[in-house]
């Protein structure tokens, strides 16, 4: 079996990049996209703003305290979706095996692509040049033998960077990788690993699978596999699923429900994008909202909404209000749909048709 070649592409500060492209006066100022009111939240920001310490999900008031000259513009999800479609169309000219994760990132499996003499590195370089030239924004790319490593690689030289992990380099690369870089390792899991003396993937390898499974259950085996740089997940163009959802974990807790309201439009837009990418036109049976509070308690509320064909923000707002009757700091927020459980055939459409 041929060694897989996976590319992960991630648009740099996507919403802000689109705003700077369309309004050149914003290119040289610290810029945030998000709610402009006193209780608004930063959805994303450009790198000039990040230099002041501004981050996604940060309350707007704190962002302006850190960066008094911060310019804030409201999000325009329709425009961002259109730009996303341009980017994804370019990716699909390289291969049909494209798995979008959100509006601004995707995996590509280029194992069997003959272009550029089969060099995934040259393919990634070509894609970055095309997106820059034709769309007017930059993307960072990571090339590796699997999805886990490709995603880490794309973040390695952000913004506007390319990083490659070849198969012979995997062992040395992961041995020094901090455990916080592993998918699914948040503050709590990292603290538990640190308590065991595990700071890097090399430490985790030395600890062994048996101890990890004893301490973390099934997650322990997955951690052990990632610590060795192993990930057999395929790039999935479409699949039949019982539900589709998107969620976002915030590096800084959302302070209240008003802040959650600010984040919801982007979540719903990403959900609809994911539904269209998966090409699933099964009847929607339920909508749900998921919240994880700062104390790590997790709550989900779902309601039957069989008349909904394309979920809208207004469909999820009552669920959020009911699930969160009073203000509490929120660590994670998600939205999703469940499909009716029947044997009706699923219509699979080509992406972006």
Curated annotation (Swiss-Prot):
Cofactor annotation remark: Binds 2 magnesium ions per subunit.
Domain UmuC residues, every copy: 6-186
GO CC aspect terms: cytosol
GO BP annotation list: DNA-templated DNA replication; error-prone translesion synthesis; SOS response
Major subcellular location class: cytoplasm
CDD domains per the UniProt record, alphabetical: PolY_Pol_IV_kappa
GO MF annotation list: damaged DNA binding; DNA-directed DNA polymerase activity; magnesium ion binding
Highest taxon of the lineage: Bacteria
EC number assigned by the record: 2.7.7.7
Residue positions binding Mg(2+): 10, 104
Active site: 105
Subunit structure: Monomer.
Role this protein plays: Poorly processive, error-prone DNA polymerase involved in untargeted mutagenesis. Copies undamaged DNA at stalled replication forks, which arise in vivo from mismatched or misaligned primer ends. These misaligned primers can be extended by PolIV. Exhibits no 3'-5' exonuclease (proofreading) activity. May be involved in translesional synthesis, in conjunction with the beta clamp from PolIII.
Name of protein: DNA polymerase IV
